Amino acid sequence: AICTGADRPCAACCPCCPGTSCKAESNGVSYCRKDEP
């Protein structure tokens, strides 16, 4: 299974990798970012 790594744009094909979540950025693009502890 392919997942989207941290600091990469969220992709419909590939969920964010474990430990990261899709977060909307100020430029309107959503990126997978590391979860905050």
Swiss-Prot record:
The record marks I2, V29 as: Important for the neurotoxic activity. InterPro entries: Toxin_16. Expressed by the venom gland. Keywords: Calcium-activated potassium channel impairing toxin, Disulfide bond, Ion channel impairing toxin, Knottin, Neurotoxin, Potassium channel impairing toxin, Secreted, Toxin. GO terms for molecular function: potassium channel regulator activity; toxin activity. This excitatory toxin inhibits insect calcium-activated potassium (KCa) channels (Slo-type). Pan-neuronal expression in Drosophila is lethal but flies engineered to express the toxin only in clock neurons have defects in circadian rhythm but a normal lifespan. Belongs to the neurotoxin 11 (kappa toxin) family. The presence of a 'disulfide through disulfide knot' structurally defines this protein as a knottin. This is Lambda-hexatoxin-Hv1c. It comes from Hadronyche versuta.
